[in-house]
């Protein structure tokens, strides 16, 4: 009988301790946890495309967890960080959405192969300049095509024209 009463006594002590411990963390944490406001961050995202175009997106985010914030931008490269501001950049393995609609490869006034939004004109500003080309080495129809602009709508078309033009670089 003494054995049962000792067992009941131990069981009672363990149950009391368990009830105390289960309630203890919430009481202890409530007293120690400080309330923090989420961090407000201006995020700038830059996508750099093969054709030289850059798209920029601005976002304002509330950051509750830095681990979650960094995980959300795992595929991006951190370029700049200061209080309340973060700049991320990503190299895209494609041409820009705008170039898929209206991209042209042409030659600038100084004979440099360049990409343009729309047909190259004397006043057109190139998106990206690539390399100098010797126009005299080109066949006359290729010269004309390049001067009026060669359209590209896909990454493959863009790469084909650039690779072909490299053979005429000076």
Curated annotation (Swiss-Prot):
Cell location: Forespore intermembrane space
Keyword Signal belongs to the record: yes
Signal peptide per UniProt: 1-30
GO terms (BP aspect): sporulation resulting in formation of a cellular spore
Organism superkingdom: Bacteria
Primary subcellular site in the record, as a coarse category: membrane
Keywords: Signal, Sporulation
InterPro entries in UniProt: BofC_C, BofC_C_sf, BOFC_N, BOFC_N_sf
Subunit (UniProt): Monomer.
Function according to Swiss-Prot or TrEMBL: Inhibits the SpoIVB zymogen from undergoing autocatalytic activation by an unknown mechanism, and in this way plays a role in the sigma-K checkpoint of sporulation.
Protein name, per record: Protein BofC
């Amino acid at each position: 009988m003494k054995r049962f009463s000792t067992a009941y006594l131990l069981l009672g002590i363990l149950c009391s301790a368990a009830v105390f411990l289960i309630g203890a963390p919430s009481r202890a944490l409530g007293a120690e946890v400080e309330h923090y406001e989420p961090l407000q961050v201006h995020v700038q995202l830059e996508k750099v495309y093969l054709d030289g175009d850059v798209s920029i997106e601005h976002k304002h985010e509330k950051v509750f967890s830095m681990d979650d914030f960094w995980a959300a931008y795992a595929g991006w490269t951190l370029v700049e960080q200061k209080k309340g501001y973060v700049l991320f950049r990503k190299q895209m393995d494609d041409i820009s959405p705008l170039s898929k609609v209206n991209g042209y490869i042409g030659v600038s006034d100084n004979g440099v192969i360049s990409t343009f939004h729309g047909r190259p004109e004397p006043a057109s500003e190139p998106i990206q300049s690539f390399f100098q080309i010797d126009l005299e080495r080109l066949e006359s129809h290729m010269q004309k095509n390049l001067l009026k602009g060669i359209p590209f709508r896909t990454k493959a078309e863009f790469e084909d024209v650039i690779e072909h033009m490299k053979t005429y670089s000076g």
